Amino acid sequence: MNEALRDLAGYIKEKLDGRVQDWMVAYDELTIFVEPGDIVDVLTFLKSDVQCQFFAFVDISGVDYPARERRFEVVYHLLSPRQNQRIRVKVSTDEETPIPSVIEVFPAANWYEREIYDLYGVLFTEHPDLRRILTDYGFEGHPLRKDFPLTGFVEVHYDDEAKRVVYQPVNLRQEFRNFDFLSPWEGTDYVLPGDEKAKQ
């Protein structure tokens, strides 16, 4: 394990006085885990502390783990050009518990938080404009949740006769098929065209 990252993790944990729930090093990057209510203070510290200087905001991403009690993980990626280090800050939440917006610390987080709200349904408090950014105005649900149907709920297409966009229920071309993935597949007994050389 990289000693510099271990030292950095110890320093951050000491300075943040109990706000870091856990930490780990994977792929030469430090990951720390914090509670939703502490995210603004933690990111402010990581950005402004002289030993850290993680002032380059890379992005925020969302992850859905349906089996967990707090199924959503919001992951903040920061870079310290002066320390030549990256850090990942993870916050877990559920469908009901909002996370404080970090726009005051990193203004570039605005659209990332809107994307996570749109695609996962994670709520951010004190966000100035928390509305959908990628899906259509009347879209129902959050498409990156694991429980969202693969086919969606409606099909959208432009109707040339009506000269407008039309929403229709999903029309699957094939009925639902239940595959038995546990049974072994033996293959065919006959030679397919083009496979004559394989039988010789």
Curated annotation (Swiss-Prot):
The enzyme's E.C. designation: 7.1.1.-
InterPro entries tied to this protein: NADH_DH_suC (IPR010218), NADH_quin_OxRdtase_su_C/D-like (IPR037232), NADH_UbQ_OxRdtase_30kDa_su (IPR001268), NADH_UbQ_OxRdtase_CS (IPR020396)
Main localization of the protein described in the UniProt heading: membrane
Membrane-topology descriptor: Peripheral membrane protein
Disulfide-bond pairs as recorded: none
Matching PROSITE patterns: COMPLEX1_30K (PS00542)
Reactions performed catalytically: a quinone + NADH + 5 H(+)(in) = a quinol + NAD(+) + 4 H(+)(out)
Known role: NDH-1 shuttles electrons from NADH, via FMN and iron-sulfur (Fe-S) centers, to quinones in the respiratory chain. The immediate electron acceptor for the enzyme in this species is believed to be ubiquinone. Couples the redox reaction to proton translocation (for every two electrons transferred, four hydrogen ions are translocated across the cytoplasmic membrane), and thus conserves the redox energy in a proton gradient.
Family from the record: Belongs to the complex I 30 kDa subunit family.
Designated name of the protein: NADH-quinone oxidoreductase subunit C
Source organism of the structure: Chelativorans sp. (strain BNC1)
Gene name, Swiss-Prot/TrEMBL: nuoC
